[in-house]
Regions:
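Hydrophobic small-molecule pocket/channel-lining residues, especially in calycin-type beta-barrels
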Residues: 22-165
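Positively charged n-region of N-terminal signal peptides that target proteins for export
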Residues: 1-6
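Cleavable N-terminal signal peptides
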Residues: 10, 20-23
């Protein structure tokens, strides 16, 4: 009887010790976030006309990040990647230059990333999210194409799921 009870306890505890660290506690960071162009600053410019980022948590705990942008001249673009938020560089498709990003969580809703272009460190971004979870500010600093970058990008949550309202 003791053996059966011990085996049952072990079976119940296995999921608690084997769950993916990224799979728990980051639900408030997911959803569709739309850039408020008027409240944002981007140096060097110009600012995009439209930009949105969709963060979708996948079953294995990783996060799919999709960014859609319409630049100042009206050209559209789509960037996509999946990150485990473990600080390791991962490929990003659709970017104007070959790039990777390494994401990591700072807490339940905030994160930072390091971007590399053609193997060289480019920019670092860090988010802060309002207490009500409706506004995310992304500060990006570094160098791109030989120019200093300093962006303060203000995003407003449009949806808590992966589809816009």
């Amino acid at each position: 009887m003791r053996t059966i009870s011990a085996a049952l306890v072990a079976l119940l505890l296995i999921p608690a010790f084997t769950s993916t660290p990224g799979a728990q506690g980051h639900e408030r960071a997911m959803g569709v976030w739309v850039l408020n162009v008027e409240k944002s600053t981007m140096q060097p410019g110009p600012k995009p006309k439209l930009q949105s980022s969709t963060f979708t948590q996948l079953p294995d705990g990783s996060v799919k990040i999709e960014t859609d942008v319409t630049d100042a001249s009206g050209q559209t673009g789509h960037r996509e990647m999946v990150s485990r938020f473990d600080g390791k560089q991962e490929a990003r498709s659709g970017a104007p230059q070959p790039s990777t990003r390494a994401y990591r969580w700072l807490d339940e809703v905030n994160f930072e990333f390091e971007e590399m272009i053609s193997g060289q460190r480019s920019v670092i971004g860090r988010t802060t999210t309002s207490k009500d979870g409706k506004v995310r500010t992304l500060t990006v600093n570094g160098m791109r194409n030989g120019q200093p970058v300093h962006n303060v990008e203000v995003y407003e949550r449009q949806s808590t799921s992966g589809t816009p309202r």
